UniProtKB/Swiss-Prot annotation:
Keyword Ligase set for record: yes
Species assigned in the record: Streptococcus equi subsp. equi (strain 4047)
Protein name: tRNA(Met) cytidine acetate ligase
Subcellular location per the Swiss-Prot or TrEMBL entry: Cytoplasm
Record's keyword terms, sorted: ATP-binding, Cytoplasm, Ligase, Nucleotide-binding, RNA-binding, tRNA processing, tRNA-binding
Length: 366
């Protein structure tokens, strides 16, 4: 039987995600971001709600990406997620993309030319951001034209690199409806960005997500719920460079800007440059918020939920893969658990995110 892996955030789950799951083959395993997501912000609703949405729409198993995989640049995000999915026994990786290409061929190319392609990146001028350098690399070695603002396609190219040299079939699925960053309300399939933007419009959310009721009744948070905590950490930290990926220049820019801004968006605008993209700045601010430092990734894999098929699959691999189904006195990943504690501070009604939580089983909820 085909075992398909899907890397996702479901922030929040919408009909485009439902379509992606419907097109994936066989047993479907989702490696999902936790309570903070790749572009450096808190998820709109918590990881347990998002896992439930996935399970109600065809996923068989949902596992959590550790914080230092979830909140990373595209290449590290992709590599960490693919590594976890491979340990869970996938043979296929399905992903949405704005541009259907022969990604399998690109993966073979990268497995053969990785050393030269990496060396090419080092020759590019420093004023270019890493995403710009990556686009230039693919244009030089594979003839791909500049991809512009197409995040799913850019992420797909990171999956290409992460899957190089592995026995893994790539299954690109054409993204339907609104663009990734589109805030438009008049698309047949609205984006997660649009749902977050218009979350107060109940009718819009109801037409945009098969799980609207779950989204609307769950505690919802944005960066602004955490700005006072972030500001406190910045103003009181003796040295911001102690935190993950904060260098002297970023520390200086953040410290200089924090007293004159009133929101996270204003802080990001003040700190970002051509070299330091807004996404990178948001990730760095997230590291400061949760006091993240470099640490090894956890050996165990945290299970958020499963169907009957997913449970049967877990039984076949549990002897070879350490699976965490309940976090108690013994921690799973201290950094991820600290991030969960910070996340809970964003809303007075936010439920417990770690201690004693057990995997969601849709059949048991019916």
């Amino acid at each position: 039987m085909t075992v398909t892996g899907i890397i996702a955030e479901f922030n929040p789950f919408h009909y485009g995600h439902q379509y992606l799951l419907s097109q994936a083959k066989g047993l479907k395993i989702v490696a999902m971001s936790g309570n903070f997501v790749q572009r450096g912000e808190p998820a709109l609703v918590d990881k347990w709600v998002r896992a439930q949405m996935a399970l109600e729409n065809g996923a068989d198993l949902v596992v959590e990406l550790p914080f230092l995989v979830s909140v990373q640049s595209a290449d590290y995000f992709a590599q960490g997620a693919v590594d976890i999915l491979m340990r869970l026994g996938i043979d296929t990786l399905a992903f949405g993309t704005e541009q259907l290409l022969d990604y399998q061929k690109l993966s073979r190319l990268y497995s053969e030319q990785a050393e030269h392609m990496t060396a090419y990146l080092a020759t590019l001028p420093d004023h270019l951001s890493y995403p710009q350098k990556t686009q230039s690399m693919w244009e030089a070695f594979a003839g791909l034209s500049a991809t512009g603002d197409r995040p799913n396609h850019l992420l797909a190219l990171s999956y290409v690199k992460a899957s190089a040299g592995k026995k893994l079939q790539l299954q690109p699925i054409k993204r339907l409806g609104a663009g990734f960053h589109s805030e438009a309300k008049d698309q047949c399939l609205s984006s997660a960005t649009a749902i977050r933007k218009h979350i107060a419009d109940r009718a819009f959310v109801e037409k945009s997500s098969p799980n609207a009721a779950l989204i609307l009744r769950a505690p919802q948070v944005t960066w602004e719920h955490y700005f006072p905590f972030l500001k406190y950490h910045i103003l009181t930290a003796p040295d911001l460079t102690q935190f993950f990926q904060v260098n002297d220049e970023l520390a200086s820019r953040i410290s200089a800007a924090i007293r004159s801004v009133a929101t996270v968006d204003e802080l990001v605008e003040a700190v970002a440059t051509k070299h330091y993209t807004k996404a990178r700045v948001r990730r760095v601010l997230t590291y400061i918020l949760v006091k993240a430092v470099e640490a090894p990734l956890p050996e165990g894999i945290h299970v958020l939920g499963f169907s009957k098929k997913g449970q049967a699959h877990l039984k076949t691999i549990k002897a070879s893969v350490p699976l965490i189904s309940r976090i108690g006195a013994k921690p799973w990943d201290q950094l991820t658990q600290r991030a969960d504690t910070v996340y809970q501070l964003g809303h007075t009604d936010m439920p417990e995110q770690t201690w004693g939580c057990v995997p969601i089983r849709p059949e048991a909820m019916n």
